[in-house]
Amino acid sequence: MAEDISLCLDRLGFHKFSICGHSLGGKVAMRLACDFPKAVDQLIVVDIAPRTYPAEHHLPTLTALLDLELSKIESRKEADHALTEKIPNWAFRQFLLTNLEMKNGVLTWLPNLQILRRSIQFLSANPLQSTDQFSGPSLFIRGGKSGYVRNEHFQEIKKYFPEAQIETL
């Protein structure tokens, strides 16, 4: 994915750029900065650290979304109600439901959930190798209530991104 972005930006005439990514996009942005350090002017990573996360954490959510019988559901409100038992956190459900789209009168998921479930081990892995490093300006932004970027991750972040600043919202 990082190489695809680099090729696309190069074709569009962007030879020096800043990149910002959230979650999986943050992993791609980190990989891009390490692979193409001369092209990346600044790196901003939101709510993810350069580490492996437990893939099992996401499987119940993906299963709940895949088990939803969208052919019998007519609105996001109905989908929200149907997911309440398996995904009790209201705010998280609302976030997930932003990926639900009405196409020709039928609700469909924007992401390919089957591919996400099959690829979850790969997607949860640390995108960087032990020798990777980006020495340019880097900002890691974390949510105050999020568990994805914890204080104990700071040393690991600094290993890969020695100029990194970490901010909490």
Segments (PLM) and residue ranges:
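Active-site acidic short loop of glycosyltransferases
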Residues: G13-K16, P37-K38, S135-G136, E163
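Conserved alpha/beta-hydrolase catalytic His-Asp/Glu region
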Residues: E56, S71-N126
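Gly/Ala-rich beta-loop-alpha elbow adjacent to hydrolase catalytic centers
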Residues: G21-G25, A29
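Active-site loop/oxyanion-hole signature of alpha/beta-hydrolase fold enzymes
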Residues: M1-C20
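Conserved serine/cysteine hydrolase catalytic core
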Residues: N104-F161, Q165-T168
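Flexible "cap/lid" loop of the alpha/beta hydrolase fold
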Residues: M30-S75
